């Protein structure tokens, strides 16, 4: 085991060294300084994108080297002398009673020494009579309000004013907690000092949109597993654990000191966790599944969800001024800045999809160097980085799948993130529908498909022109553009396949079967 860790450490260090060498080489030996202003400007843009990607790579690898990715050990529940009361908030706005019934039943089935001390509240921002009747039928509490000010955060803050237990668990309407959720989370508040919240991962009873559309159910992990089981766990070291809006247990005092759930951004959850941690409280992330929810099953809802997350993080940056906020250490600030910078990947990916076409189609040189020298420096760096990422993350995320996810999402996020950053603020909070049945291609899906098709055709043209020009020129002049364009064609082809498999499914057609190494629940499609 020690040799395995040492090997991973060596790979990380070597990758970092080679990346530094490559960037230095790119800056001083590859810019087309004598080929005109246009070539130089475009070359600098591409170089800056490479440096930006390398900084993200550095941040990630350093976190891996300096942190322990093991989940904190769960303390024994018997350390608690007096069993406290716990309020359970289930947030809802327009979700169906069927979805809520499943979550309420799971909350009522949570194990606890004294179940009379579990107080379940359905926090209905839709103020619906049918939901009120459901809570009466299921013998749980109902809280509503006449307006939707501050959306989900306002909903929770309204519930805070009407409850008084020292601990508060929060769940989305579709997130059915595991039986041992409270027995897993509560002991941390007694075994450690100043714990503000404990965050557990989520899993799903149906395949995510990538697994389903690409026919990879149980062959690849849930897209969010990488975040919950790798990135979040590493954040324990720097006390920068992200509150994800559901599957968490808070101390009421920490929320009181943070002035309740954060408002004014579309990502009230991340902002709330950050403010709680800035007040001196600790956030703890565990590797143990805390609830099973329902994955978004249509692209329009998925796109709105990711857009809300992206724009919300940028709004958080602007409102709370992460780099100057009081109470956070430098490393905490950098960790939260990485949450923001991540969402700009669409801009970077779009530049990579277009960059090789500058030379293959328009003949604009953006890398001016000896090809053999370039390959001898770039290839080992590229291979080692990919190998390093793959061996570190194992089956959670591969570099290939990471590029597939980014290519699919680029048309969705690229310009919206840029618009939010320069000041076009989105204020409406779109609740994500979790189960829809529609067998026609949505408008958003068509828009994204048109983007992917356009980029695919451009790269095909570039690829053909590379081949054609080889007959008139030395192959060395085109091999870099040739390989780069071929790579883009592969990722864009997968994206088009994703776009074309647009038929949605009903999550009820998926039922739990057995534990498996990826999704924790193997899922079988019921034959109708």
Protein language model annotation of sequence segments:
Residues 84-89, 119, 256, 271:
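Cell-envelope/extracellular polymer assembly enzymes that use nucleotide-activated donors
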Residues 264, 273-291:
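Catalytic donor-sugar/metal-binding loop of nucleotide-sugar-dependent glycosyltransferases
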């Amino acid at each position: 085991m020690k040799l395995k860790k040492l090997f991973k450490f060596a790979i990380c260090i070597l990758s970092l060294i080679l990346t530094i060498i490559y960037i230095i080489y790119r800056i001083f030996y590859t810019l087309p300084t004598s080929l005109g202003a246009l070539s130089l400007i475009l070359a600098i843009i591409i170089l800056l994108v490479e440096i930006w990607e390398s900084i993200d790579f550095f941040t990630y690898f350093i976190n891996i080297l300096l942190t322990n990715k093991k989940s904190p050990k769960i303390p024994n529940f018997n350390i608690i002398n007096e069993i406290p009361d716990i309020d359970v908030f289930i947030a809802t706005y327009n979700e169906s009673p069927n979805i809520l019934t499943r979550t309420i039943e799971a909350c009522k089935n949570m194990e606890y020494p004294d179940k009379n001390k579990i107080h379940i509240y359905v926090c209905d921002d839709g103020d619906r009579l049918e939901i009120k009747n459901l809570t009466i039928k299921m013998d749980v509490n109902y809280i509503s309000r006449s307006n939707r000010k501050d959306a989900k955060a306002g909903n929770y803050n309204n519930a805070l004013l009407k409850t008084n237990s020292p601990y508060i668990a929060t769940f989305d309407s579709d997130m059915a907690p595991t039986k041992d959720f409270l027995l897993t989370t509560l002991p941390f508040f007694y075994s450690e000092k100043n714990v503000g919240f404990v965050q557990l991962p989520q899993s799903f009873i149906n395949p995510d949109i990538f697994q389903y559309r690409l026919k990879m159910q149980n062959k690849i992990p849930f897209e969010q597993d990488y975040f919950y089981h790798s990135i979040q766990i590493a954040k324990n070291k720097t006390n920068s654990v992200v509150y994800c809006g559901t599957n968490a247990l808070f101390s009421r005092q920490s929320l009181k000191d943070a002035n309740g759930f954060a408002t004014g951004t579309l990502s009230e959850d991340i902002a709330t966790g950050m403010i709680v941690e800035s007040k001196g409280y600790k956030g703890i992330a565990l590797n143990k599944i805390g609830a099973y929810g329902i994955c978004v099953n249509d692209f329009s809802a998925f796109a709105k969800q990711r857009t809300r997350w992206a724009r919300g993080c940028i709004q958080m940056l602007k409102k709370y001024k992460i780099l100057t906020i009081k109470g956070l250490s430098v490393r905490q600030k950098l960790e939260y800045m990485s949450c923001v910078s991540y969402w700009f990947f669409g801009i970077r990916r779009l530049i990579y999809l277009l960059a090789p076409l500058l030379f293959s189609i328009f003949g604009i040189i953006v890398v001016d160097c000896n090809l053999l020298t370039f390959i001898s420096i770039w290839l080992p760096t590229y291979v080692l980085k990919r190998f390093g990422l793959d061996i570190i993350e194992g089956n959670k995320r591969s570099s290939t799948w990471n590029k597939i996810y980014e290519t699919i999402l680029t048309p969705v996020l690229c310009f919206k993130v840029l618009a939010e950053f320069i000041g076009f603020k989105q204020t409406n909070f779109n609740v994500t529908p979790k189960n829809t049945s529609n067998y026609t291609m949505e408008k958003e899906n068509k828009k994204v498909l048109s983007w992917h098709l356009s980029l695919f055709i451009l790269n095909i043209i570039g690829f053909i022109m590379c081949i054609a020009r080889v007959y008139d020129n030395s192959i060395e002049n085109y091999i870099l553009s040739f390989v780069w364009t071929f790579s883009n064609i592969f990722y864009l082809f997968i994206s088009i396949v994703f776009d074309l498999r647009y038929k949605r499914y009903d999550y009820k057609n998926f039922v739990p079967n057995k534990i498996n190494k990826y999704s924790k629940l193997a899922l079988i499609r019921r034959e109708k």
